[in-house]
């Protein structure tokens, strides 16, 4: 599987599982303690249906939004994660650069 073959969350997860050493994949893919919060957050998406607007032009799609008065090009928040250098040599700097490149937010842990 290649990046160009990824079309949804499950595809990206499969690719990561193939490419990363097992301990690093499980560190990223895992959750804290007994993973109850992870399971609840994940299962909450089972109750959400995305209903497409069929026959609507998609030549110009705008994902931008405004959060706290700042316009963002993407509605994503890149959260801090410990040990990011395990999966990229530049660690948090790489995530910060990506947030800047795509004009979205990146959190810093204290």
Spans of features found by a protein language model:
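Hydrophobic faces of well-ordered beta-strands that scaffold small-molecule active sites
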Residues: 76-79, 104-108
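Conserved, mostly hydrophobic/aromatic
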Residues: 21, 78, 99
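Glycine-rich loops and low-complexity Gly/Arg-rich segments
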Residues: 52-53, 101-105
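Glycine- and other small-residue-rich loops at beta-strand/loop junctions that grip anionic moieties
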Residues: 30, 84, 108-109
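N-terminal active-site wall of soluble small-molecule enzyme domains
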Residues: 64-75, 83-98
């Amino acid at each position: 599987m290649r990046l160009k073959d990824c079309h949804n969350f499950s595809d990206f997860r499969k690719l990561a599982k193939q490419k990363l050493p097992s301990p690093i994949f499980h560190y990223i893919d895992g959750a804290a303690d007994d993973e109850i919060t992870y399971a609840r957050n994940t299962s909450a998406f089972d109750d959400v249906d995305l209903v497409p607007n069929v026959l609507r032009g998609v030549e110009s799609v705008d994902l931008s939004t405004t959060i706290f008065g700042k316009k963002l090009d993407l509605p994503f928040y890149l959260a801090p994660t410990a040990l990011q250098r395990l999966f990229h040599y530049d660690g948090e700097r790489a995530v910060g650069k990506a947030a800047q490149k795509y004009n979205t937010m990146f959190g810093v842990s204290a």
